[in-house]
Curated annotation (Swiss-Prot):
Gene: DBP2
Domain Helicase C-terminal, first and last residues per copy: 362-509
Broad EC category: hydrolase
Residue interval(s) of motif Q motif: 128-156
UniProt source species: Coccidioides immitis (strain RS)
UniProt-annotated binding residues for ATP: 172-179
Protein name: ATP-dependent RNA helicase DBP2
Amino acid sequence: MSYGGGYSSSRDHYGGGHHSGGSGYRSGGYGGSNGYSHGNSNGYGSYGGNSHGSGVGSHGGGHHGDRMSNLGSGLKQQEWDLNALPKFEKHFYKEHPNVTNRSAQDVEAFRKEHEMTVYGKNVPRPVETFDEAGFPQYVISEVKAQGFAKPTPIQSQGWPMALSGRDVVGIAETGSGKTLTYCLPAIVHINAQPLLGPGDGPIVLVLAPTRELAVQIQAEITKFGKSSRIRNTCVYGGVPRGPQIRDLSRGVEVCIATPGRLIDMLEAGKTNLRRVTYLVLDEADRMLDMGFEPQIRKIIGQIRPDRQTCMWSATWPKEVRQLAHDFLHDYIQVYIGSQDLSANHRITQIVEIVSDFEKRDRMINHLERIMDDKKSKILIFTGTKRVADDITRFLRQDGWPALSIHGDKQQNERDWVLNEFKTGKSPIMVATDVASRGIDVRDITHVLNYDYPNNSEDYVHRIGRTGRAGAKGTAITLFTTDNAKQARDLVNILTESKQQIDPRLAEMARFGGGGGGGGRWGGRGRGRGGFTASNAAPLGHNRRW
């Protein structure tokens, strides 16, 4: 039998049912006055809202508006007396003789071959086979039954680190095998703890940004936890709470959750985190991207501070570094791949040197070419809210179906705009960096940097909105002489990803210096630009799309 919450164990498997509900939008228009509700457009005026903060659309993610920011306000502040807490075991790693006998040169060569860099004190050596990892036989047999030949690089180094009981940071691309890197040590951890008693919450908590990822993680834990009869549940928004509540009340050793729905459950008293001694933050960068940082902080505040914490991320921006600094203790880190700031190699990067006066014409030229393909979806970044409103108004008056999203827009309007963009009803969205933190749209084909950001990290972050999930993408950047101080960093990124470089940009890099200055988010902009302003500008009669 199947419920949309996803309780599973070796004894009974209530699958992590995919439910497409929870988008929070009802059909029907706002009326003709706003210039949007053409045909079957879902209207702003009938916005229903998702009562569980699962996000807009089917991703169950970053709906970080008024309600999300208040999530967790009902949670009681925990005061921890470590001496009074029950003791628990977290040190399981015993180095295999084969690993011990390898020379330091062999270890270094193995790490170099697999682009593996480690940081921290007394980092364990990597293992090269499943048997060397030191997992109990019941875990090894499950792994070998799946037909894996040998550990992936992140597993080779990550397993000894996680089994050692230390706090761990792992930076590796999606698809690198990181789920098993924390799942198998989690199973060993659970089996070393006392059994759950009545009213106990989970022992292992995995936080993930989206319901899709949460369900994938659940499938792995179900597969490898079967022989240990480990029970798990998947807790995410957009589906009925009943089955999830039922799972939690029965007792589960593992809870995989998106932050918003987990806080719902904690505030409602449906579970607690008193027994959690192994915490995983998966795709930490994406969770922060989606606006979940306040919720993550509130959740971690409910967990005993001597827990083991493992943080996994595809990138290592300063926000993720800050989270690690705040919540991990004396952590060890493994980095798979180059540590230079680099862009996704599936993205074609086009940088054009222009004057400020040429920007609008260049943008229109690109739109005319891009929007010939009706499947195209373009995200345009500006440096300020004022510019976002100005070019949205300009585009709409020229007949382009553009909408803007920034910090001065009301949350319900931002949600509505995002849904129009996701569904392709308005395939052009203009955004500032701050507002883009809540954008999790997989099928963006193009990113256009109308204004260049204040630093290279933000550039890589912006263009990473396209080329997701194995797809190709295109990023177009309008670069002016005012941006010259960023030229050297930009050329380095373009060179690393083997892109063509405009000779004028190369010249700027030689003479214009490097290293970005300025504030994190660019200018502040003036004016509120509410729903009756740029987004309400009627589409011009010369329909361009």
